């Protein structure tokens, strides 16, 4: 919440290991981990947003433009993940995690070189961020904050926007994983689509 980055990069690998230990079918382990990770961002994002709102850092015009695209992108991200095998998803997520680790380890930060585009351009950027976030099972902060910083948005506003935008990503992404996994015969008990309720409740 402090840095606008959710816990998906930690939650997803832990869930993958946990589901593997429980004997969940290998072909759905990663999908189940991604689908279970996203709903947690609704709760953490709301809590973080309240704090940023009280601090007066929330730019609702910018958030509405980003959020509209993120809703569409996150739904498509979940549908895309459903088309990929667990092994392919693992490779994609691993590459993303290494990229984030290198970025933080080398302290690579985008320079403010431009300004936010208009409503359409901002919405398209939101859709891309939402698509990738749902594909990786994260709230989007690791992409939203750098994108907004690159577009000369002050850091406090960028972090606040990231917290707010994690909720439409989490909502649309969760629904897409629920829909994609509905009725899958290999799901463990207490699953709703690709969302495993006991793990979700434990994380929240």
Predicted features by range, described:
Residues 1-3, 10-31, 36, 45-136, ...:
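Juxtamembrane transmembrane-helix boundary motif
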Residues 164:
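Active-site pre-Tyr helix/loop in NAD(P)-dependent dehydrogenases
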């Amino acid at each position: 919440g402090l840095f606008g980055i959710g816990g998906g990069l930690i939650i997803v690998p832990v869930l993958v290991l946990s589901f593997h230990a429980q004997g969940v079918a290998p072909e759905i382990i990663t999908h189940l981990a991604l689908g279970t990770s996203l709903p947690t961002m609704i709760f953490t994002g709301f809590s973080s947003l309240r704090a940023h709102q009280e601090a007066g850092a929330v730019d609702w015009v910018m958030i509405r433009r980003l959020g509209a695209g993120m809703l569409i992108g996150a739904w498509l991200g979940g549908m895309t993940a459903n088309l990929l095998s667990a092994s392919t998803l693992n490779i994609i997520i691993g590459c993303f995690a290494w990229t984030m680790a290198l970025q933080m380890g080398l302290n690579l930060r985008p320079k403010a070189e431009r300004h936010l585009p208009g409503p359409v351009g901002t919405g398209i950027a939101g859709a891309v961020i939402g698509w990738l976030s749902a594909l990786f099972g994260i709230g989007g902060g690791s992409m939203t904050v750098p994108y907004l910083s690159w577009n000369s948005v002050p850091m406090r506003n960028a972090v606040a926007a990231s917290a707010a935008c994690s909720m439409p990503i989490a909502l649309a992404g969760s629904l897409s994983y629920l829909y994609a996994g509905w009725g899958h015969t290999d799901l463990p008990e207490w699953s709703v689509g690709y969302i495993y309720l006991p793990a979700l409740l434990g994380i929240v």
